[in-house]
């Protein structure tokens, strides 16, 4: 594989391709400053009890691991494992337990006042049907037929809710989790080792309370604190800082421990392009922008196996029919 392919896939930046192909001047030696780096206390995410190592860099506290938080719907809400395919929404159908729950919930919805017919309550019959259903003495079809006889509007409303079942939080959670667990089994447990790959929209909502998705300026502050000259940190669509990627990657002296997780990269074609696992790392920032005046994009950081520098530039946030997926680190300010 050409060394240029990962860069083209990640950013589609003519400037980046030119920079990588031309080589430029001899690399300048940078004396990085580790005096501002200290190990931080472990952080336990109260949402799921995941524990993260942290590192203090100046007056910032960074997670030293990629985020592993799964939103309710997993990939349906923008958090993917490696090579995970989208959930087929047409196949999210309720099982008997879910239909029973929908019937029970709909019947007891106070908005419908017991589904009385001409002022006559049907509760005594329906309560009995639901009990028989839960005991396995009636089928769902039999219950629906009997309730339809008592009040056709009930079954009409139930039909609408069944058609919208895939939109319910519990349905999305079950379908997303099932898809995720199958994918993790197939790929050997990618997320446990590398964290989720997030869409830009999901990345913006993924941080625990008190933390945030770092902005482009947060990243530049990290880089400057480590000793990257300000003028170089500000370079856009460019590789910056000879040795900076080594410092930030797993085993580097900064303790940041960026993992070469790969990502689902930007490319014009509509297929999935999970690329560069064990070769490159990609991180979203919280800083959005637009390309060509209207194309949604965001600032990112990446490093690839063919350089010790870190790229600062922009990436589109979506492809044709599929999202772009990168890793997430979280940061907070120290008082």
Predicted regions: what is each one?
Residues 18-21:
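C-terminal motif of bacterial Sec signal peptides marking the signal peptidase cleavage site
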Residues 1-9:
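Bacterial N-terminal signal peptides that target proteins for export
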Residues 27-109, 121, 167-335:
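Conserved positions within compact, well-structured domain cores
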Residues 23-25:
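Bacterial signal peptide processing site
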Residues 100-107, 123-134, 140, 144-151, ...:
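Residue-level detector of alpha-helical secondary structure
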Residues 113:
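Alpha/beta-hydrolase fold active-site neighborhood
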């Amino acid at each position: 594989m050409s060394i240029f392919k990962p860069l083209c896939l990640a950013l589609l930046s003519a400037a980046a391709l030119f920079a990588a192909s031309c080589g430029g001047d001899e690399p300048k030696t940078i004396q990085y400053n580790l005096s501002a780096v200290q190990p931080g206390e472990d952080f336990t995410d109260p949402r799921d009890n995941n524990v993260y190592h942290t590192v203090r860099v100046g007056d910032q506290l960074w997670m030293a691991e990629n985020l592993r938080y799964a939103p309710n719907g997993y990939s349906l809400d923008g958090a993917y494992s490696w090579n995970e395919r989208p959930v087929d929404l047409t196949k999210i159908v309720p099982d008997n337990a879910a239909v029973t729950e929908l019937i029970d919930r709909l019947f007891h919805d106070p908005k419908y006042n017991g589904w009385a017919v001409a002022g006559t309550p049907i509760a005594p019959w329906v309560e009995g049907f639901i009990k028989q259903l839960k005991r396995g003495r009636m089928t769902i079809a039999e219950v629906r037929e009997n309730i339809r006889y008592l009040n056709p509007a009930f079954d009409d409303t139930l039909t609408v809710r069944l058609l919208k079942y895939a939109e319910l939080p519990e349905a999305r959670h079950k379908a997303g989790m099932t898809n995720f667990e199958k994918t993790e089994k197939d790929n050997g447990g990618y997320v446990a080792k590398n964290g989720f790959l997030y869409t830009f929209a999901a990345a913006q909502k993924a941080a625990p309370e008190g933390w945030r998705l770092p902005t482009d300026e947060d990243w530049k502050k990290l880089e400057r604190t480590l000793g990257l000259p300000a003028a170089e940190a500000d370079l856009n669509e460019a590789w910056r800082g000879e040795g900076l990627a080594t410092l930030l990657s797993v085993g580097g002296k900064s303790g940041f421990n960026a993992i070469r997780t790969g990502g689902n990269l930007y490319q014009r074609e509509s297929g999935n392009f999970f690329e560069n696992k064990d070769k490159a790392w990609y991180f979203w920032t919280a800083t959005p922008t637009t390309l060509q005046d209207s194309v949604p994009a965001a600032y990112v950081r990446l490093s690839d196996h063919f350089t010790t520098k870190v790229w600062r530039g922009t990436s589109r946030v979506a492809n044709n029919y599929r999202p772009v997926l990168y890793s997430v680190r979280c940061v907070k300010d120290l008082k």
